[in-house]
Amino acid sequence: ADIVMTQTPASVSEPVGGTVTIKCQTSQSIDDYLSWYQQKPGQPPKGLIYRASTLASGVPSRFRGSGSGTDFTLTISDLECADAATYYCQSTYGVGFGGGTEVVVKG
């Protein structure tokens, strides 16, 4: 059966310097085969984290991924205006993306 990715919340608004937590739940265990992506309007998705917790090259440590099995979390600390974007989780089994979380940063 296809793995269903459930991502929450759909949107979140926090001030500059704040912290955002995004959760992704899968309908069956995917071990740590989960990636997180950031997408800004008119741009392709940018990979942030792979294997649940490993930062992609050049991604600041303000971004942190955790979890395994069916429950995963992306935490963005010390929010900057440039972090305003939509964030997606994806199983690296290639079964599609979560529904996305729009992050609004209040400056």
From Swiss-Prot:
Residues 51-57 are annotated as: Complementarity-determining-2. It comes from the Eukaryota. PROSITE patterns: IG_LIKE (PS50835). GO terms for biological process: adaptive immune response. Pfam families: V-set (PF07686). Residues 36-50 are annotated as: Framework-2. Keywords: Adaptive immunity, Immunity, Immunoglobulin. Residues 90-96 are annotated as: Complementarity-determining-3. Residues 58-89 are annotated as: Framework-3. Residues 1-24 are annotated as: Framework-1. The sequence of the B4-type C region is also given. This chain was obtained from antibody to the specific carbohydrate of group C Streptococci and was isolated from the serum of a single rabbit. PANTHER family: IMMUNOGLOBULIN LIGHT CHAIN (PTHR23267). This is Ig kappa chain V region 4135. It comes from Oryctolagus cuniculus.
